[in-house]
Amino acid sequence: MSNIAILAGDGIGPEVMVEAKKVLNTVASKFDFEITTQDYDIGGAAIDNHGNALPDSTMAGCIESDAILFGSVGGPKWANLPPTEQPERCALLGLRSHFDLFCNMRPATLQPALSSLSTLRSDISEQGFDVLVIRELTGDIYFGEPKGRRGEGEEETGFDSMFYSRREVKRISHLAFQAAQKRNNKVTSVDKANVLATSQLWRQVVEEVAVEYPDVELEHLYVDNAAMQLVRDPNQFDVMLCPNLFGDILSDICAMITGSMGLLPSASLNSDGFGMYEPAGGSAPDIAGLGVANPIAQILSAALMLRYSLNQGAAAKAIEDAVSNALDNGVLTADLLPANERKNAKSTSEVGDYICKQIESA
């Protein structure tokens, strides 16, 4: 039996999580495995109830779990708190740090049926694409020390430090090559090795790791060229392996060219296969409680959890196929429809119900 910590959070988090749990129960029944779920407060809801965005009780529940299914956190109510107390920073960074979740996987898929949503030219978007961005999460300029500000007046200076160790690059590289072996056997490593010492080390270590995966093609791109190529022809990519800063930027480009953040799941993993799974989008407080939120990113996050942490690949594939059927058959929330067709939009629960029925009938 697998134990899942459910951290629905704020905004639309609770309502899309209902649909993800519904789908999980459906595939568990279909594929004859057992899961248990336990709900815990996180983010703004936890601040209101416990005075802390990441309470001890929530952390204890996560420690006892086999995986974390995370919703979304934050909203205007908590926006004026000190930065270290804000839901997004306290909750997410606290969990990433405690569990050493160094690998972020964000699939970005555009199905031809939804090509009109993409910001790309129609001749590009109509081909569809399927890119997996693997981003190192715990190193790079975000966490390097020293950092800060010093001096006064016109001479005041802000500074940051960019660091990567051989160990950090090696472990994320192995995961990228292993992911490529399960896809289309190509890794594009992104760096700025013509300028940065960290990128020179990054490229060297990636090439050393690549020797262990002779069936996987490796190419290197400078980050500026990678950004340009993503919007020129995303179909050329399979797995993109990125340092923290570059991956942060490129994964958001991938999100934009799919046309909706409501479709994009993500996984954050450690070396033991423990992971936290969450939608790529935010808490969308402006539509919370209206029953119009798109639950697909949350549902696909549950599919990633089944694949990478719970060893239920067939169940994950069943969810993904059911989602594809929903999209192909026009079972869409309002964010996926042009303004003149939104009268035909399905509610959050209707989309979840349809996906469950597709799984049951497959």
UniProtKB/Swiss-Prot annotation:
Does the keyword Cytoplasm belong to this entry?
yes
Kindly report, in one word, the top-level EC class recorded for this enzyme: oxidoreductase
MF terms (GO), sorted A to Z = 3-isopropylmalate dehydrogenase activity; magnesium ion binding; NAD binding
What's the catalysed reaction? Answer: (2R,3S)-3-isopropylmalate + NAD(+) = 4-methyl-2-oxopentanoate + CO2 + NADH
Q: Where does Mg(2+) bind?
A: 224, 248, 252
Give the GO terms filed under biological process for this record. Answer: L-leucine biosynthetic process
Q: Where does NAD(+) bind?
A: 75-88, 282-294
PROSITE patterns hit by this protein: IDH_IMDH
Return the annotated site residues (Important for catalysis): 142, 192
Gene Ontology cellular-component annotations: cytosol
- Pathway(s): Amino-acid biosynthesis; L-leucine biosynthesis; L-leucine from 3-methyl-2-oxobutanoate: step 3/4
Give the cofactor binding note.
Binds 1 Mg(2+) or Mn(2+) ion per subunit.
Q: Which cofactor does it need?
A: Mg(2+); Mn(2+)
Location of the protein in the cell:
Cytoplasm
Q: Which UniProt keywords apply?
A: Amino-acid biosynthesis, Branched-chain amino acid biosynthesis, Cytoplasm, Leucine biosynthesis, Magnesium, Manganese, Metal-binding, NAD, Oxidoreductase
- Record carries keyword Magnesium: yes
Binding-site residues, substrate: 96, 106, 135, 224
Instruction: Indicate the principal place this protein occupies in or around the cell.
Output: cytoplasm
**Listed EC numbers:** 1.1.1.85
Q: What's the subunit arrangement here?
A: Homodimer.
Query: What does this gene product do?
Result: Catalyzes the oxidation of 3-carboxy-2-hydroxy-4-methylpentanoate (3-isopropylmalate) to 3-carboxy-4-methyl-2-oxopentanoate. The product decarboxylates to 4-methyl-2 oxopentanoate.
Annotated family = Belongs to the isocitrate and isopropylmalate dehydrogenases family. LeuB type 1 subfamily.
Name of the protein: 3-isopropylmalate dehydrogenase
- In its UniProt entry, the species of origin is given as Colwellia psychrerythraea (strain 34H / ATCC BAA-681)
